């Protein structure tokens, strides 16, 4: 499990006060760019684990929920919070990495 690249998007969250939400990119001028860059960095690390035998990962979480803004989409599902094409490209690289050989018996 990996992820939690959260930032607050006003008028698209469960609560607009953001009082209890962690906004990891609040000081970044371009939150979408900063979050996307970090996602790509996560994927760069995952590639190395695939070569060593990793077979699955789970991103947490797909959408923002009540008091958490860690989603790839906002709570109302109207805004994609990361650069869709860069995320797709990073994900597709997983299919190009040779899998580790199965352990011998």
Which residues does each predicted region cover?
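Substrate-binding clefts and catalytic carboxylate motifs of secreted carbohydrate-active enzymes
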Residues: 1-105
